[in-house]
Every structure is written in C-alpha cells, then in structure tokens.
Amino acid sequence: MCLMTGIDSRARETSSLDIITHVAGQAVAASPRSAVAHMGQAMVLRAQGRFEEAIRAYDAVLTLNRNFVPAYANIAYAKLTAGSTEDTIPLVEQAIRASARDPTVGNWYDLIGEAHLLQSRTDEAIIWLERARSAIPTHAAIRAHLASAYALDGETQRAATELTEARKLSSNDRYTSLARLQAVVGYWGVPKLRALFEATYFAGLRKAGMPEE
C-alpha cells in the first residue's frame, strides 16, 4: 500500500508525469500477469484524472488477484470521483471485510461516510465518519466531513466544534473559507459529483460556520 501511495503522490507532484506514465505502461507490458504492475498503472492514471481508464486498470488487478485488498478501496475512490457514488460503498465494505485491521481502515470508514454524505444519507454518514474519527483523530479532512454532516443534521454546536478541530489539524489554511478549500483541493470530480458536493458537503460547511471567502 505504501508503494502505491508513493506512486500516486509522485504522479501528482512530479513535472515528469509522462515518464512515470511510460514506465507504468512498460511494467504492464513486461508483466501483464502482475497485479502489482497493473496497480501501479492504475494509480498513475488516477493521479492524472483519467478515472475511467484507472477503473479498468483496477479491474485488471482484481481479475488477476481477488485478494489484492488495496485495489478495492482505490477503485471505490476512482468510481466516486467519476460520479458513481452508489458503487463506492460496497467496494470499500469488501476491503474492510478482507482486512479489518488494515492501518488505513480509518480512511476507508471516511470514504464510506463521504459517499453517504454526498447521497444525503446524513445519519449513516455520521455513523461512519465517527468511526473514522475514532480511528484517525488527527485527520483534518475527516473532521471537516463530520462537521458538514453534523450541521446538515441540525447539530450546529457539534459541527462548529469539528470545524474548529479541522482548522487546528490542517497543515494549511484550507478550512478558513469555502473559496480557499475549493482552491486548495482544485478538482472535485466530474460535474455530477461537483453538484453533489455543492448540495451536501459545502452546504453543511456553510451551516457549520465556514464563510464563503
């Protein structure tokens, strides 16, 4: 999992993305039966925002090895960003069933909570986001997701508390305003998903006390 995360990070940060893409393609060509090679290619494609291609690459990973647990959570993320919110939760639940003690399980809880939040299932979102907070109490984004969910559920004081924690825990000032958050993150998925963020996550943050500017 660390290797794949490293590939994803480098793909986002490097100025030589074409080289990484080429190397990932060469790895698949050299070892077409290697789940790891396909996983590396999928992570690069995801970092490029080529989510449909990334999903196909993740599918190849699971075709080769159904027990490659990181692929389930990563394909769920790719599907969510591509607008397939309904497909996200079963995939992450499968990852949790296969590896409940995974050190990144808190991120998986958060992803399920976020998917519920985007579909306006606020009560279920809160359940999963509270689990995520318990698993990773210092994760700023989880606190922000929970702030939004609490606010949408009418729990404004708890929402304000979580938003304050998100601001304290963040390594930058992204939670000072909606404009700053949107600028720092940059890409919020396909138009369908962006509309869901606006109707749920951003709306909740406004109710929690986050200003526009």
Language-model features, listed with the residues they occupy:
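Alpha-helical protein-protein interaction modules
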Residues: 3-7, 12-15, 20-28, 34-37, ...
